[in-house]
Structure formats: C-alpha cells, structure tokens
C-alpha cells in the first residue's frame, strides 16, 4: 500500500506568489519523511479528481521539480555568488544531498569555484559539459541544496582547490566594468564680512575595458576689499589599468610612488607595481587616520606634496578624518586648521605602513621611471628611477631592498623584517645615499629606520605603529635634492582678516638643517567598559638646530547609557614658529531619549537628537565653550543638522548653524557662523555624474570604484545599506565606493517599490576591478498585479496547473478554485495553462484588464480558457 505524503513545492524559474487561499493550502502540505513510496491523493484536494493537476512530480519524498533556480552559492562555508543554476532530476548518489535535484555546472563555473582542473579534469571528449556533477568528478566533493532557503552548499576538499587562502576570489569573476564617462565634483564656499572664498575640486575620467583615464584638478578663488585672486591647479592626469596575470597595476602620467621602502614622492612618468588589493583580505591592509582638535568652527585643509587633497568644515572639539581617498594616502599629510578667530594650527601627520612582512613565497615589486613632481614652487623636476622588491622568506622572515637613481642623487636601501610571534613584528633597514645639493656641494650619509607593531589582545593594547629613524649628518633624500635653493619658503596668498591680501607660508626648507631623528607613535588602549585611551604623535629634529617639528595628541573616550564623552590634549610645534600650540578639549554628547527618561527607545527622533557640549583651553589661557543641539532627520537619516552657541574669554560670544542633506543626486551642506568681529555663510555641494550606454545618471560623490544599478522602470527604489541612494525616474542609480576585487552585495529595497513594480530577484553581487564602473542589472516587471479566476467549460481549472503569460514569460500556478496570482502583467494578453501531458491537459485563456487597473493595488478579473485546436 502506498503511503500518502503531503506536498509543499515551488516551481522552477521565477514563480510569482499565489493567492492567499492557494498559499495557505501549499503551506500546509509540508513534506514528511517516510520510508514507503509516496504519492499524492488528489481526492484530498477535491472530490472531483479531474480538477487536480498531475502532481506525480512531487511523489519522490522531498524532491522538487527540475529547472532553473536563483540560489545563494556557498563553497566551504564561504559565500561565492547569487546566480541562476540549472538543476536536473537524478538519483541520489554519493555526495548528493540535494534531494534528487542535481546542480549542473559548466567547466567555467567549476573554475570559478577555484577547482584545480589540471589535477581534477572535469570535461572529457564526447561528454556533455553543460551539466557536470561535481561529486562524480572530484572525490570527497559534496553538494547539498536547501530548497527552502534557496542555498546551494558545496563542499570541496582543499586538495582540489587552486588557492586555499580564505577570501580568495578567482580572477574569472573580476569585472572590468562598462565603458563610461565620470565626473566627481565638490564645491565649497564661504561669504563673510571681510572676504569671500570658493574651492572647486573636479575628478573626471573615462573608462574603456581595463583602461581608466583620470584628471584631478582644483580651482581656488578669494576676494576681499581691493583684491581678488583665482588659480586653477592641475593636480594630475593619468592612465591606469590592471595587469591581472601579474597581479599588478600600471599607471602612466601623474601619480605618487609607494612608501613601503622609500618615502613617497610625486612623479610624472610610469609605474608598474604589485597590487595588494588583488590578494585576499588576510594578506594586506592599513589606512591613515588624521586626528586633531578644533577650538572653533574651523576649516580643515589637508595637503600632500603641495596639493590640497581634502577640505572640509569641522565643529569645535576633537575630530578624526578616516575617509581620505586611498590613492592619496601615501606620504606625509600637512594638516591646517583655520580657526574662526583667525588663528591657525599647522602640523604634519606622517604616514608609514606597518612592518613590511610578506607571506613565504610572495614577491612584491614596484618600478617607477619619470620626472620628480611637486606642487612646491621651490622644487625642480629631475628625472629619476626607483625600484623596490619585498620577498617573503621561510621562518617568518621578509627581506627587502631598493634603489633611487637621479642625475644628482644615488640611494640604495636594504632591510629585513620578522614576525616575533607573541612579541609582535619588527623591521629594520638602512639607506645609503650620495647627494649633490643646490649649492653644488656633495654629501653622503646613512639613515637607519626601525618599525614595530604589536597588539596585546589580553591587555587591550594596540601598538599600531611605533617607529624611529636616525640619519647621519650627510644624509639627504630625493625630495631634498629637488630644491633649487638651500633654503626658502613656498607661499600662497590669502586674506589676513583685515581686508588685506598677504602671503602665507605653506612650507619652509633649509637644507643646512638636514633631518636627524624622527620618532612616531600610534598606540591605543582598550579599557573595556571604561572606554579607551589613545596616543598619536611624531617628532622630527634636525642637524645644526634645536628646532623641531613636533605633534602629539593624547585622548580618552568613553560612554555610559547612551552618553558619550571624551577628553583630549594636543601639543604641536613647527620649525620657525613662535612657540608650541597646546589645546585641552572636553566633549560630551547626550541623546534626548536619555534626557527625557526614555533611555531604550529605538530609532525614534529622540534617539537621533543630541545635546552637545564642548570646552577647550589653549596655550594663551583662552577658555571657550559651546553648547548645542544636533541630530538626523528623515526616514533614511540622510538629513543632519547642528545648532550651537558659545563664548570665548578673548572673543566674546559666537554661534553656528549647519545642515547637510545626503540626497540621491548629491550632497548639499549649508552653514552660518558668527562671532564678535564677523560673520560668514558657508556651503558645500558635491556629487557625481556618470555617462553610460543607457544615458546619464546623477549620483552622490563617486568613489574610485562604483556600481551602476539598472532596474528599468523601477523608479524611486531605495538601495539597501546606502544612505540616500535610490533609483531615478528611469530606474538607474549609482552605488559609490565599491570594494575592489571583493564581492559587493547590491540589493533593492522591495518595500519601497510601488504597486506595479516587481523584480525577479532583488539581490545581485559584483566583483569590480580597480577604478571600474560595473553594472548590476535587475530584471524588473512593470505592470498590473492581478488575481484572475480562470475557468474551462464553466469549471475551475485544476489545482496546481502551471501558468505562463505568453508575451512576458511571467509564470505562476493555479490555486484554489481556479485562482491565479500574477504580477507585472500587461493589460492585455494570453495565459497558457497546462496540468498534465497531452493536448487535452492544456488551454489558453485570453484576458483584458481595464485601464484603471494601473491605479489599484490588486485587480480582480476572470477569464475563460479555450483548448487549442489540434
């Protein structure tokens, strides 16, 4: 006797939801495990067994119908991709835990999974390669298809894989992107009592295949009583592409050298270097953070090699800049904080990587040839060559070296690093250089560098970077040799706050004071529930003078029941300055939900509104304080605001108000500041423009690598985990700041779709190469959502019959009483319905919906099914 088993199924392809009645029936018919043979008793579903479709395909326990399913593919517990995979019916065999469905893989897909096809051939002559069963080709391989969650788990023995590093993504999955034109812009300005100033930054480019053409420029304008000045700076133009077989990048034009072995310098020429980004996350990673303390609402400017690479307005108190463009984060960063009262802080943040350790067997190289390039008007452009190599050796050792060659300069460096286990990691190197300076004097000397990094996990201490460099009296760098004179200033002109245009020294050099010792430190200490401490700083001293360039910042931060507070102290001094700048600052932020006693409210306007207080004291004994209110508004938290009022013992009362809106087509910020002597307005407008084969799309500020989202007709749909990003009126959007050579999840928020928009699958994944604009396309259906009751000869169609709209290909299934739920349906068309084999088990149901169906959430209609002529 056959054992009756209940049924729950899902048809292959993209099956639209059923009517509520049909869904409740299907949800109840859950499969039960049984040793006996199973079959479906149609009499249970209807007394008239002829009114039930042929359900024999579900009589194999938990077997599902073969076809194409969109599944999440996991290999050895690592996510690979979300893709359409074809499944065929087959007997359950060794390694097959998919319930009778056999996933079909092509040789290309098997390579994508990282299988070593040379050791494990997967295709034979004369054998169908469109459906390869992994367990049959690879001993120990297993596949398991979880139909309920649409997850395909693949287990492969490590011996069968080309690369066992965690996070490895085969180059076959890397996407070079689509042809495109890109513009990234940022426009900031201020209008005050005495002067106006504007700053426009433009990064434009073209993408074609693997090639990226970029130009970076900036325009400065200032105007005061009786003067005005403007200047356009061409910061750089370059062409770049990936050399995938070499895991390298080629750059031609204006760029910077690496800073692994030598200090970074600008050049105009060509560079070929190993790309860390092409390797898994476990093999690389470090980025600089610029910290400081602003006493007032200040303008923050960061320069590198004489060029302005970052400019923004910061609130009083401690700040940390973590979003510098990675392509501009090599070499020392010159930080300028222009305070509201006219005072200025200047200090240098050195940037050096952690010790240069490489895995055993890995070789990293960097070759550069070109003219030295700097934004400093005091320097020339000598031609030079630079080559470095870093090699991972056994026993945790790394050896490295390199050379710099120019007409008036020769340098060679050798060094080694080692992993000390529980003691951290260390590297030591020595550089010998022979230099001819601007006065034609010849010098030679050595420089010894020591770097150390260590995380004391048991104590919460992290020595992110601890370094020291000692140089003999005759040691000079390529940057020193490029100066045209032995000493001098590089000037820019600005307002002195009293309606006069005055020169402002941006940098000073004196080659008679060669660098001697340089110490840098970056330490953090986690105190658990009691907060954290950090110490960052550097000190550079020189031969023949007691002056130093020194900057230190010590800070403590903690929180309690939603309240956050911090105390920080900074000390800075530059060569030629009148004295050291010292600032002590305290900051506190309290959510309104705490002030009102609703401490644990979740995502309400009270949680998003903060009362703030900050106070600071400088070296002159000037005390100042500010209180304010700030927070975020709108559903997506993309409108932020701040209002403050304060007082200074030297400058009286002051205040500010600012707001920033992160919109779909860009970011807009406005602000107002005043004090006893002046007031000013400032604003910032930034965004991106992308031209592609389907038109032009406006966006928020672009990153180096971006994703173009294509969902035709799906307007106003939000992108998950992207503040303020949603599709435009055509269904296009740009997701900025994609991670290169990594899986990027792109998901449409289906809750923001209108009643007539559906998407086959709202999630896609892409793996872009450096600088690419990759397309994430979604198959959208724009049309009517309808429940159509179809009848044949006056009787409902059989339950479980397959339905397909002939023009659009939309599929569904007949539910209870002949009801069919369909979405994305054209106003007029035909439904092809089949419930068994033979011409008598199919029919065609023409339908026509009213125009006002487009205004309804769901339309109810009926149709008569007609058997096709033989």
Curated annotation (Swiss-Prot):
State the membrane topology: Multi-pass membrane protein
Give the molecular function GO annotations.
Answer: fimbrial usher porin activity
Q: Where in the cell is it found?
A: Cell outer membrane
Signal peptide location: 1-27
In terms of superkingdom, the source organism counts as: Bacteria
The species is Salmonella typhimurium (strain LT2 / SGSC1412 / ATCC 700720)
One short Pfam family name for this protein? PapC_C
Output this protein's name: Outer membrane usher protein FimD
In the UniProt record, the gene name given for this protein reads: fimD
InterPro entries per UniProt: Fimb_usher (IPR000015), Fimbrial_membr_usher_CS (IPR018030), FimD_plug_dom (IPR042186), PapC-like_C (IPR025949), PapC-like_C_sf (IPR043142), PapC_N (IPR025885), PapC_N_sf (IPR037224)
């Amino acid at each position: 006797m056959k054992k009756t088993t209940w049924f729950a199924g899902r048809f292959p392809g993209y099956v639209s939801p059923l009517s509520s009645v049909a869904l409740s029936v299907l949800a109840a018919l859950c499969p039960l495990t049984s040793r006996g043979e199973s079959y479906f008793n149609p009499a249970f579903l209807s007394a008239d067994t002829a009114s039930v479709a042929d359900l024999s395909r579900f009589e194999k326990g938990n077997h599902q119908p073969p076809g194409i399913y969109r599944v999440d593919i996991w290999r050895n517990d690592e996510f690979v991709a979300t893709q359409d995979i074809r499944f065929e019916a087959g007997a359950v065999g060794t390694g097959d835990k998919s319930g009778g469905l056999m996933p079909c893989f092509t040789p290309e897909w098997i390579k994508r999974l990282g299988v070593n096809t040379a050791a494990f051939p997967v295709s034979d002559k004369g054998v169908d390669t469109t459906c390869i069963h992994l367990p049959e080709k690879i001993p120990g391989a297993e596949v398991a298809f979880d139909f309920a969650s649409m997850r395909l788990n693949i287990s492969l023995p490590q011996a069968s894989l080309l690369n066992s590093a965690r996070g490895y993504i085969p180059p076959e999955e890397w996407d070079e992107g689509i042809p495109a034109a890109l513009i990234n812009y940022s426009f900031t300005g201020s209008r005050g009592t005495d002067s106006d100033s504007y700053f426009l930054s433009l990064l434009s480019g073209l993408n074609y295949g693997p090639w990226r053409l970029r130009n970076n420029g900036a325009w400065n304008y200032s105007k005061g009583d009786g003067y005005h000045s403007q200047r356009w700076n061409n910061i750089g133009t370059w062409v770049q592409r990936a050399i995938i077989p070499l895991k390298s990048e080629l750059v031609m034009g204006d760029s910077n050298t690496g800073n692994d072995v030598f200090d970074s310098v600008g050049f105009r020429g060509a560079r070929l270097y190993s790309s860390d980004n092409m390797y898994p996350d476990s093999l690389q990673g470090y980025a600089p953070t610029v910290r400081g303390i602003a006493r007032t609402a200040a303008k923050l400017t960061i320069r590198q090699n004489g060029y302005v690479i970052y400019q923004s307005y910061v609130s009083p108190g401690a700040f940390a800049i973590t979003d510098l463009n990675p392509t501009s984060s090599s070499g020392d960063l010159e930080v300028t904080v222009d305070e509201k009262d006219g005072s200025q802080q200047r200090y240098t943040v050195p940037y050096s990587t952690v010790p240069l350790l490489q895995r055993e067997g890995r070789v990293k190289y960097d070759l550069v040839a070109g003219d030295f390039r700097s934004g400093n008007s005091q320097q020339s452009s000598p031609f030079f060559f630079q080559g470095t190599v870093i090699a991972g050796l056994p026993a945790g050792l790394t050896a490295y070296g390199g050379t710099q060659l120019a007409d008036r300069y020769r340098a060679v460096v050798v060094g080694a690093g080692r992993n000390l286990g529980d003691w951290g990691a260390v590297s030591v190197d020595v550089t010998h250089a022979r230099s001819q300076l601007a006065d034609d004097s010849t010098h030679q000397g050595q420089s010894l560098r020591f770097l150390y990094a260590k995380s004391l996990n048991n104590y919460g201490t992290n020595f992110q970077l601890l370094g020291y460099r000692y140089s003999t009296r005759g040691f000079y760098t390529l940057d020193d040799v490029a100066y045209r004179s032995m000493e001098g200033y590089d000037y820019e002109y600005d307002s002195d706050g009293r309606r006069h245009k005055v020169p402002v020294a941006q940098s000073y050099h004196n080659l008679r004071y060669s660098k001697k010792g340089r110490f840098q430190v970056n330490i953090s200490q986690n105190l658990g529930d009691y907060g954290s401490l950090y110490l960052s700083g550097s000190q550079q001293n020189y031969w023949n003078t007691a002056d130093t360039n020194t900057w230190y910042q010590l800070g403590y931060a903690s929180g309690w029941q939603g309240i956050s507070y911090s105390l920080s102290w900074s000390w800075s001094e530059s060569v030629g300055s009148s004295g050291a700048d010292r600032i002590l600052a305290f900051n506190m932020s309290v959510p309104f939900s705490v002030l009102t006693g609703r401490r644990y409210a979740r995502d309400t306007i009270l949680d998003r509104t903060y009362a703030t207080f900050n106070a600071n004291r400088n070296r002159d004994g000037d005390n100042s304080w500010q209180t304010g209110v700030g927070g975020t508004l709108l559903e997506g938290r993309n409108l932020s605001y701040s209002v403050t009022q304060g007082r200074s013992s030297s400058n009286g009362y002051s205040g500010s108000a600012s707001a920033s809106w992160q919109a779909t087509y860009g970011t807009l910020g406005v602000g107002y500041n005043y004090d006893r002597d002046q007031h000013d307005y400032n604003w910032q407008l930034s965004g991106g423009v992308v031209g592609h084969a389907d038109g032009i799309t406006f966006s928020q500020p672009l990153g180096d690598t971006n994703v173009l989202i294509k969902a035709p007709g799906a307007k106003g749909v939000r992108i998950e985990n992207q503040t303020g990003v949603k599709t435009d009126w055509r269904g296009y959007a740009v997701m900025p700041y994609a991670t290169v050579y990594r899986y990027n999840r792109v998901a449409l928020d289906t809750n923001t779709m209108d009643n007539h928009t559906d998407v086959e699958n709202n999630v896609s994944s892409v793996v872009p190469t450096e600088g690419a604009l990759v397309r994430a396309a979604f198959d959208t259906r724009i049309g009517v959502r309808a429940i159509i009751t179809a009848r044949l000869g006056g009787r409902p169609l059989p339950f479980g019959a397959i339905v397909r709209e002939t023009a659009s290909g939309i599929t569904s299934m007949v539910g209870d009483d002949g009801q069919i739920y369909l979405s994305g349906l054209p106003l007029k068309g035909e439904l092809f319905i089949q419930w068994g084999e033979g011409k008598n088990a199919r029919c065609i149901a023409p339908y026509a919906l009213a125009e006002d169906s487009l205004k309804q959430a769901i339309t109810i209609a009926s149709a008569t099914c007609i058997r096709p002529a033989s």
